[in-house]
Amino acid sequence: MAQHDKLATYGYSFQTKLIAALLIDKLFTKQIIDILDVKYFESEANSWIISCIREHFTKFKVAPTLEVLKIKLQDVTNDVLRASIVEQLRESWKHIESTDLDFIKDKTIDFCKNQTIKGA
């Protein structure tokens, strides 16, 4: 997958804020969950987080809490990956009140729709 086919095009902070938006905005998560693919993320930690959010949201119709993610994290046997996931969640949580989350959501929806059209 080419660089422009990944959310890395928008940078690390963008992806971190996207995770924050998914964790706190149920309506946004519902809107994008079916077209947001883990392959759009370069980082294995981000892919793991997105996968957990998708799985949990599909089953329970709400994003997982940090407590749920902490419990799921116990299944990760790779210490380096586990540390990376914890750090990513910390960084994401710092952005839950960012003033540009609406912009992040709009850009993500556009990106995912374009990727879906490309793949059709």
What residue spans do the PLM features occupy?
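Noncatalytic partner-interaction/assembly domains of nucleic-acid and motor enzyme complexes
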Residues: 1-111
